[in-house]
From Swiss-Prot:
It comes from Pan paniscus. It is a multi-pass membrane protein. One of its GO terms (molecular function) is bitter taste receptor activity. This is Taste receptor type 2 member 60. It is found in: Membrane. Keywords: G-protein coupled receptor, Glycoprotein, Membrane, Receptor, Sensory transduction, Taste, Transducer, Transmembrane, Transmembrane helix. Receptor that may play a role in the perception of bitterness and is gustducin-linked. May play a role in sensing the chemical composition of the gastrointestinal content. The activity of this receptor may stimulate alpha gustducin, mediate PLC-beta-2 activation and lead to the gating of TRPM5.
Amino acid sequence: MNGDHMVLGSSVTDKKAIILVTILLLLRLVAIAGNGFITAALGVEWVLRRMLLPCDKLLVSLGASHFCLQSVVMGKTIYVFLYPMAFPYNPVLQFLAFQWDFLNAATLWFSTWLSVFYCVKIATFTHPVFFWLKHKLSGWLPWMIFSYVGLSSFTTILFFIGNHRMYQNYLKNHLQPWNVTGNSIRSYCEKFYLFPLKMITWTMPTAVFFICMILLITSLGRHMKKALLTTSGFREPSVQAHIKALLALLSFAMLFISYFLSLVFSAAGIFPPLDFKFWVWESVIYLCAAVHPIILLFSNCRLRAVLKSRRSSRCGTP
């Protein structure tokens, strides 16, 4: 899903790998279309009504970052296959990497803030801190967005410095992409600079996400356990709302976890890029990315309303 460090100079000729690459591209298109629809639907409502629920603001921001991220990865994939012998840190790939680093960090932080918002608003803990956060969190939304912009920009600049230094070293020593000395310098920089920076950048939002997810699942479990003791049980509207939220959160968590693992595996070089196992893993990741927008479409009331209005307009009903 990341497309961060594809090692160029090798080609995929195996028929199975070619099929997986084709499936991967189709899944990317589905993910782009799904996130594009979410962004357009909520974005238009935001512009027309001049207001939107804080949760939906985070959702449209996440959809927009996902949409742009998928587009950048698609562009990088096309460039890699058109120019397989290009140096991984040439100006074109540096430009694409700059966009990818920013959008990747933005996606992680938007996902994290959305999980924080779900946890605070849906969880039924009686601790005074939760009651205080319920009243304050909505007003903090602009600062949450500004903080993600600042953190994403800062880490993107650090990544760009490392990438640019490797390219300058490549030009200075007239190294070839397959040169042993050049590869050793790249490996040293990637191992002792880029990899630790990536782990710090990616682990911070992931840790917050997991804490919020555990708290929310614990709260929902307690609430549904109490509901079983009532006469209405799972037919209680509040319980059904919690179940829908839990399903949406679980799909969200699966996508987040798979995305985080893909970043770590790619940075650690566990799956050799352009290898068959690499494409199998990428296909699984993008399957989650393609399914998640569909789940959001049916779990979000505003998005469901947009779908119903589109259906009614196509059928010619008022």
